[in-house]
Amino acid sequence: MSNVTLNLTGDATTSVITDSSGNYQFSFLPLGGNYTVTPTKVALTPGSTGINTVDAIGAQRHFLNLGTPLSGCRLTAADVNADTSVNTVDVIAIQRFFLGLSSGIANTGKYQFAPASRTYSGVVTNQTAQNYDALVFGDVASPFAQ
């Protein structure tokens, strides 16, 4: 995923932004250091691409028990108010968001990363393949990215 900011704290402090392929690199860190890396990405704005009618319908079908129930990341993405259930409040928030209106729920359009951060102790070699998974609250149809 491009344009993700990775904040590094610990024995050094810096940040980098992923390139168009989602790659990133921290350079010139002191050997043997202890670090925490935390990814963040600016939330979508109401009406922007990424959340649309298909997402609202997916959440509504889950709520009404029509078809295959949502699970995993899709279920998390549909539960925009984070109350552990997908209901009318979530569906309306997703609808309002893709129409360009405030959803009234702060999570709608925000990114969530897994893991939320990574901690490294005594780093003496390059740490490769340190990927994060991401979802966007409200993006029920295609919530995962790497």
Give the label of every model feature segment.
Residues 1-146:
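Cellulosome-associated attachment modules in secreted, modular CAZymes
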